[in-house]
């Protein structure tokens, strides 16, 4: 199965329209360009967890609005999204679904409002993706995606995570790479 992991740059403060409207803070544009240029560690970790019988494609989508043609040849598309770009992520998911390609979505926004996200995809991952990723792949292969994969409560030990699949990146496109030492908030708020 050909699996596409789509990373959407998270901060759009370099968007010409936003800048024209004056929606910026001094220095924030420069910092946001750096943040937006970082690869998705979550998706790269899922790539590292993907069994070898699947072919993984990590695709950076800097601006889904400018994407005229969808990357094709994929049997499953996984999109991780923050709230800042969720509408663009939904539009991209809708386009893939219209092309008949199953879509699974995850990330902080999707975990917060899965009932909203499921309207745009075949399955959502609530919580961390690592514990259920292989089940998502198996279910997609069998043509029976569960709809909601709930990986809560958070009990994933980051020390069990493989090294993210940095080999999928063209390192020359990034001015830095990040390392995870911890993840999420340690408090268990209701």
Predicted regions and their residues:
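Acidic, low-complexity intrinsically disordered segments
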Residues: 1-190
